[in-house]
Amino acid sequence: MNRLLRSCLAALLFLPALAQAGGGPLNVLVVVNSASRDSRALGAYYLEKHGLPQSHLCSIKVDPRAASISLADFERDVRLPILAHVANQGLAGQIHFLVLCLDVPSRVEGNNGLTAALFYGYKPPTPNAPQCHVASNSVNQYFGSELAYTATAGWNRTNAPIPFLLTAANLETAKQVVDRGAAAFATFPAGAFCLYGSADDARNIRYRTYPAVARQFALFGLSALLETNAVSSPRPPRPILGYVNGLPNLPTNLADAAFAPGAIAEHLTSCAGMIPDPCLGQSSVWDWMRLGATASYGTVCEPCAFQEKFPDPMIAFWYARGFCAGEALAMSVRNPYQGIWVGDPLAAPFAAPPSVVLRAPARNAELDGETPLQISVAAHERGAPPVYLDLYLDGRHHAPIARPFAPVGNELVAQVGTNRFAYVVAPAEDLYAAAAGLAWAINAGGAGQITASAKADRVEIAVRQPRGADGLPLPFAVSVEKGFAA
């Protein structure tokens, strides 16, 4: 049996113990429907709770009662006004998330989720394909990336932000979602991620992935946060941090369950995102918002039971690592074209942001000419020294202060038994490239007996014969040796 060995580079590179959420309030554009009083009120409330300036508020005008919008109207009345606002307000390059507030259509042409169409373009049904199929060219390149999201990275050959519908059955509930999203940040709440199942064979298709998710939690020492049950959905024994199951309707035992601020919850069924229309009596994303979730996902039309059209249960692990709800949900769905992401994308209960203090100039000081800045930065007690620093002035991105590049020439080494594998960091490589390089070195020299895969900021190593001739486990170690430019 193979033994999985995790190369623990945490203390040897500058790998955070928990990933940092990729966006903050100044990376969000709030979009309101000028034809809806509730939408305008919710947008103003979101700005207030997250401390956003007015330049981050964009108005569009669509029928507030429409459930769907034509592709032509979507381009003219939704996408183009958003792009124009970003350009006119000098926000280009810094908007990584969109929050569309209440009373906007949930779908485009009745068969694409509005957020998906904004994220990576409208995906028409494949010609001559059966009703149950996955549309061609609908793979989300951000899926499973485990990287902080920036729109300018060019995911899916676009520069599009991750869009969320901030929606609920009424304005009051929607405001409560905002409250929970704002309250969740960096709280590290106690509770459980619940990966549950059911006897519904058509919908209970994700349980096979639960052991792989549990393994990742174990490798990071987070097993206490995870509850799994492949065949039923019991009442969660602790506050819900995340919830996954496969049922058309939410279990009645959730009626009095506790949801931690920031909780992501969803269920695999036909049309949980077909709001405001009812769908075969099934529960919807609105039901999750009412119960206490902060983010969710649902499909806007019949997707059939394709697992790739729904969140991968690894979403629990990614959220626990510190990604925000927007990133965790967006990287969890391989083919999201028929779905909508719902709630507050900024919710990030496991983010570990650094403390940043501006030492000079003094607050409210009058400045004239060039002024040096004095900034002190300290790592979060659960995080690591920061590697990304950006300067914003008046709500707009002004300049990057620091970027994470691995020291050129440093040699990353993994030792498995008597086998030594090394990779020398090249110029302009970051941590992720360095991890990929080490994995390449292991695969090139392991003769198929020792293999490795790079997963964002870490490397996982598998050994076919994990014991030596003496029957004992092979010794394993990793190190960084300073190179010519250390």
What are these regions (language model features)?
Residues 402-486:
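Extended, beta-strand-rich, solvent-exposed assembly scaffolds of outer structural proteins
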Residues 7-8, 14-18, 436:
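Short, intrinsically disordered, low-complexity terminal segments
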Residues 1-9:
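Bacterial N-terminal signal peptides that target proteins for export
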Residues 3, 13, 383, 463, ...:
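Compositionally biased, intrinsically disordered/low-complexity regions enriched for serine, proline
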Residues 386, 390, 401-406:
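Long, compositionally biased non-active-site segments enriched in small/hydrophobic residues and glycine
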Residues 14, 21-388, 396-397:
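Cysteine-dependent hydrolase recognition
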